[in-house]
A protein has these predicted regions:
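Extracellular ligand-binding interfaces
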Residues: 53-75, 98-156
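Substrate-binding cleft of secreted/luminal carbohydrate-active enzymes
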Residues: 169, 175-178, 248-262, 313-317, ...
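The substrate-binding groove and active-site-proximal loops of carbohydrate-active enzymes
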Residues: 224-230, 273-288, 341-356, 429-440, ...
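Extra-cytoplasmic beta-strand recognition segments
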Residues: 75-115, 172-173, 201, 602, ...
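Polysaccharide-binding and catalytic clefts of secreted carbohydrate-active enzymes
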Residues: 339-454, 465-485
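Extracellular beta-strand ligand-recognition surfaces/modules
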Residues: 95, 146-195
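Catalytic domains of carbohydrate-active enzymes, especially glycoside hydrolases
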Residues: 221, 227-278, 282-285, 296, ...
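Exposed low-complexity, polar/acidic, P/S/T/G-rich flexible segments that act as propeptides
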Residues: 178-213, 594-600, 604-606
């Protein structure tokens, strides 16, 4: 048994440490603002001139987004974060603001735009509202120069309320349209778009500057994964700057998410939001804020000599789901994930659902081109789902049963659970299982064809999850989710692979065996056309799913195996190994320094050695 302390290279005077330097930035630097709001809204914060633009789409009368500066940087790696300064005393802030025509004018009496200040006063959290028109040179307009002296600024409509500025946690601009009504939550007759632009920010006086930490490392060969659902609130430039500083270059794997990109439209006939039926209406399926964010992300990646791979899954977020398009089990129960709220899965036999999915891929490909990047798309992970609480496969929605009958003349049989299905043989069981497998493979090939029809030079790959196709017990899921003939080279330009379950079970031999054999020997890909995602470290909220105690130091032992896993695969000559994922690298302050520590990695200041075998996890980190 190896415990953590045996794998730590002690922080002594001779032990290497990350090399860092500090640079000075202005407080309220435009790259470090965030945006967030309710799930019914869409929003994005991106570069605009010498400042930022916060764009948003409101769909409810109560929709309001917050554009925030945090005094404490909780989003960045320890050696990439800006200095924490809660005191705003001595700070004078000048900036230009521009509100969209859909927003109220600055001195609107009932909906006056404000800067909300969250502060602490003698241990009590309080809120003050700075009414912006009181500090504007043109208070009756939507464009103005704002001058705020934090030593004298006052809150309230008439600027009469003093408040302390020595312990401010956060300041927030509010983004809303003139239809905003906090007392009546109703869907708008149609979505309303808006923006707030902050430019020409100048900060003077004491406390005007902040130290920004910058780790100094050479470039290395590992890639990194990002995800829109994790980073929708950040300026994409911030993410790219951080990755470049940490030595990442070349390919970056980006999951386009499933909960924030969809355009959703209020359907009064069913009294809920729903994604559009683009086969019927021709409407865009990605909301304009997501489109802008990804265009700016692609542009920033391109400028930093990085090439994104944009991945789209088969998941459908429940908030706007069209449940007629979803996979279902024999009892018509929806296939759904265990998250709250859950996501569902697009049926592979519903033509309207597939048209929607094709358009998602095409619209994300469009953003790559707008940003100056080559089109490179990852399909999936593609699969037929099964519900883990019942082990029932979700292969029975009506279009699937109809398509099977049309193709074979047979009726879809009850396969039972994913385990029972393997003991049911003969007609129509064998035909149904084979048909399901081929349907998945053909669906992926059809997506590839749709992308290449518009972008002939596009690179397209499927993502396969090794534990789902190689398990000790063969199940229906392992069979139908591995259409090897359809996935084989050269049907796709390359293949993306992953095996995180085995790393979390300390079965690194299985992961290495799979990545070294399945893509090349089974599917015929050259090693140089095999990419691999290594990870991940579960967040505290889901650590229990994998048996870890969130209150114990479980994270570093997992990192040791992630790096050991990748170390095992170096000799294979793979196209790229990606670390899954950016939020965990930021949270744990993971640094790769091939000069200071060619055989290890840093967690903050501490150097660790990888574990590349099946050494069990320390027993004290389990529940």
């Amino acid at each position: 048994m190896i415990n953590n302390s045996e794998n730590v290279q002690n922080n002594s005077t001779v032990s290497p440490q990350p090399i860092t330097q500090n640079i000075l930035i202005d407080r309220f630097n435009p790259t470090y603002w965030r945006i967030d709001g309710p799930q019914t809204m869409s929003f994005a914060i991106t570069n605009y001139g010498n400042g930022f633009e916060a764009s948003f789409r409101s769909r409810m009368t109560t929709d309001l987004a917050g554009i925030s500066w945090d005094s404490y940087d909780s989003k960045d790696h320890k050696f990439l974060a800006y200095e924490t300064k809660y005191s705003y005393s001595g700070v004078v802030w000048d900036f230009d603001i521009e509100l969209s025509p859909s927003m109220p004018v600055l001195n609107n009496e009932s909906l006056t735009p404000t800067l909300t200040v969250y502060y602490n006063d003698n241990g009590v959290d309080k809120i003050a509202y700075i009414v912006l028109f009181n500090y504007a040179n043109t208070p009756s307009s939507r464009s103005a120069h704002i001058h705020i002296n934090w030593d004298t600024v006052k809150a309230g409509f008439s600027a009469t309320d003093s408040f302390p500025v020595t312990n401010i946690q956060q300041i927030t601009f509010s983004a809303f349209t003139s239809s905003y009504n906090p007392h009546s939550s109703l869907p708008l007759s149609q979505a309303e778009d808006g923006y707030i632009r902050i430019t020409n920010s100048v900060v003077t006086g004491a406390n005007a500057k902040l130290n920004l930490s910058r780790v100094v490392v050479p470039q290395h060969n590992y890639g990194l994964c990002t995800s829109y659902d994790d980073h929708y609130d950040l300026n994409p430039q911030r993410i790219v700057d951080n990755m470049a500083a940490l030595g990442y270059h070349g390919f970056i794997n980006h999951y386009c998410g499933m909960s924030h990109y969809p355009e959703i439209i209020w359907r009064s006939d069913i009294n809920r939001f729903q994604i559009p039926d683009t086969l019927v209406t021709g409407q865009d399926v990605i909301n304009p804020c997501t489109r802008k964010w990804h265009e700016k992300y692609a542009q920033a990646l391109h400028n930093a000599n990085m090439q994104p791979v944009f991945g789209v899954s088969f998941e459908m977020y429940s908030l706007g789901a069209n449940e007629f398009w979803a996979q279902r089990d024999w009892n018509s129960n929806l296939g759904k994930t265990g998250y709250q709220p859950p996501s569902y899965f697009f049926s592979l036999s519903d033509q309207n659902a597939l048209a929607y999915l094709h358009k998602v891929f095409i619209e994300f490909a469009d953003t790559m081109v707008t940003g100056g990047c080559d089109v490179n798309m990852q399909i999936g992970e593609p699969w037929w789902w099964y519900n883990t609480d019942t082990n029932l496969p979700c292969v029975y929605n009506y279009p699937t049963k109809l398509a099977f009958n049309a193709d074979t003349g047979l009726y879809a049989p009850d396969l039972g659970t994913i385990y029972e299905a393997m003991n049911k043989t003969g007609t129509p069981y064998d035909e149904f299982k084979t048909w399901l497998r081929n349907k998945l493979g053909q669906t992926c090939q059809d997506i590839r064809t749709a992308i290449k029809a518009k972008y002939a030079n596009a690179q397209v790959c499927p993502l396969i999850f090794f534990p789902s196709i190689r398990s000790p017990i063969q199940t229906l899921a392992t069979y139908i989710n591995y259409p090897s003939e359809h996935y084989s080279y050269p049907h796709f330009d390359y293949i993306m692979t992953e095996a995180y379950d085995w790393l979390l079970e300390a079965k690194l031999d299985l992961a290495h065996q799979a990545v070294s054999q399945i893509p090349t020997q089974d599917l015929g890909y050259p090693a140089s056309k095999v990419a691999y995602l290594s990870g991940f470290v579960p967040d505290a909220s889901i650590a229990y799913i994998y048996g870890f105690d969130k209150n114990k130091p479980y994270r570093t032992p997992i990192w040791q195996r992630i790096f050991g896993d990748m170390q095992n695969n170096v000799s294979l000559g793979l196209m790229k190994q990606f670390i899954w994922a950016y939020p965990q690298v930021m949270f744990d302050s993971i640094t790769i320094d091939t000069t200071q520590a060619p055989n290890g990695f840093f967690v903050e200041n501490t150097l660790y050695t990888p574990i590349s075998d099946n050494t069990p996890y320390p027993p004290d980190i389990y529940l």
